[in-house]
Amino acid sequence: MASDLVVQFGNILEQPTIFPTEKGKVNVVVTNQGDTQLNGPVNLKLYASTDKELDNNNLNTLGPERGANDPLKGTDELLGNLQNQNINLAPGQSQTITVDFAGSEFRTPSVVSPGAYYLFAEVEPGSNITENKANNVANQLITQGDVVIQWNAILLNAIQTSGKGDASGTPPPIGARNQAIVHAAIYDAVNAFDGSHKPYLVDIDPPAGASVQAAAVGAAYQTLKSLYPTQTATFDEQRDRSLNEIIDAPVAEKAGFDFGVKVADQILAARTNDGSAQAQRGYTPGTDPGDFQPIPPGSQPLLPQWGLVTPFAIRSVADFRPEGPPEFSSPLYGREIETVRQLGAKNDTAVTKITRTPDQTEIAQFWANDRDDTFRPPGQLNEVAQEVALAKGTTLAENARLFALVNIAEADAGIVAWDTKYTYDQLRPITAIQNADNDNNPQTKGDPQWDSLLATPNFPDYISGHSVFAGAAAQVLANFFGDNTSFDIPSQELPGVARSYSSFSQLAQEDADSRIYGGVHVPLATVDGVLVGQNVGGFVFDNVLKPI
C-alpha cells in the first residue's frame, strides 16, 4: 500500500487552559503506517470538542478578528493550523510535533468546559500525498480540577449533547433542575464524610474507610445516568476513568462509589413527583392588548406550568414574585419598547436605525446560549463557577458545597422566573414593535419589518430568565468568594473572545443587559430579573448547607 499517516497524542507537557490564558503544550506524534517513503508538507489542525465525535460542519475559524464577528454555528472549535510542516518518514517511522498554545498558530479552547473536554488532532498531507482519511484524526481527553469540577463539566457536556442534531435539548429551567439534582447528590455524598455542614436532604453515614472521591463519582454518575439515559455509555467511560485516577484502595473505592449511588437514589426519589413532568401542559394565549402571543403563532410556548414545580430550597414561589411590569398602555412601557426597538434590532429598516454599539452586539452574542446545542444559560454560569474555583484552588468539600449552592439557587430562580412569566404573560418586544401602530400608545413607533438581533424565545417577556439565573448565580458566588473577584471568561457563542469582569455583580448586570441588546426583553424585565435572582441566591446561601 502507499504511505499512510497516522496521528496520535503523545505527552501532555503542560495542561491546556481555557481562552484567553493561552497556556498549554502538547505533543502530537505522526507515524507513517504505510509501506512507502513519505516526503512532503503536511498540515496539522487542532480542535476542541465536548465529546469524542469531531463535527467538521460549521466550524468556527480563527480569522483576523479571532472569532469576534463569527458566532459559532456548530459545536466544535478549530484551534489552529500548523501549515506546511515538512515530514520525511520511512515506513514505520514517527515524528513528534510539539504544539505550544502560547505561540501564534494555536489558541486555547473557548467552547468547552475546563473540567473535561476533548482535543482533536488531524493531519492533512499535501496534494501530492495519498492519505487514508479513516485514521488521520486522534482525540485526547483533557481534564482539570477535582472530581466535582470534572463531573460538572461532564454534566454540561451532557446538556449540550442532548440538543445536538434533531434532539430536543434541555431547556434552561430543566437544565437548572438537572444541575441541582446532580450537585445536591454530590454535596450530600461528600459532606457525609466530615459532617461539617448541614446536609441538603440525605443524612446517612458513609461506610468506614470509604473513598470520598469515589462517593462524589458515584453520586454524579447515578444522577446523570437517570437524567440522560441515552448517554449512559459516556458516563460509564467517565466513571471508569475517574475511579482509575483515584489512588485509594479498591475496596475503599467500591464502598465510596456505592455510597454515592445510594445518596443519589434518595435525591432522585425526592424529585420524582416534583411537577416537572407536567410542566409542558397546555397554554391558551390571552386576548387582551399586551398579552403574550406564541412565536410563531399557534405554537406551544415553553413550560407554561414550570412555576408549579416544587422548589429545592425556597418556601414559596410567591415570596419572590415581583410586582409586575408596567401597564401596556403606559408611557413607561412605551419608552421601554422604544429602547428595545433601537438597541435590539437585527437590521436597519425604513423606520428603525440601530443605535447599538459593536461592543453591545458582542455582549448580546456572548451571553446568548439560546441554541439547544450549548450549555444553555444556567450551564454557562456553571462554567464561570468552574473557572473561578480552579483559579482559587478550592478543595473537594468546598467545591461540592459551592456547586450545590449555585445550582440549587439557579433551579429555584428558574421556577420563580417561569411562574412570573406566565403570571403576567407579557408579550415579547418583537410582537409589540411590529404592531405598535395599533397599540394606542403615543410613546411607541410601529415597525412591521423589525426583527430582534437574537432569535426571540417562545415564552413571555417579563421577567428575563437570563437575568434571573445570572442574579442567582452571581449572588451565591459573591457570598462565597467575595463580590470583588476579577476573572476572564470565554463563550461558546464567540470562540476566541473573552470578556473581563471585576465583580460577580458586574457579570450579572452585563448578562441582563445582553437581552436588551439582543432585542428579546424590555429593560424592566432584566432589572427585576436580576433582583429576583439575587433574592433567591441570597436566600439559598443564607438558609441551606450551613456550617454546623
Task: Place the predicted regions along the sequence by residue.
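Acidic/polar surface patches and capping/hinge elements
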Residues: 143-548
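Extracellular/luminal regions of secreted and cell-surface proteins that mediate adhesion/ECM remodeling
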Residues: 1-144
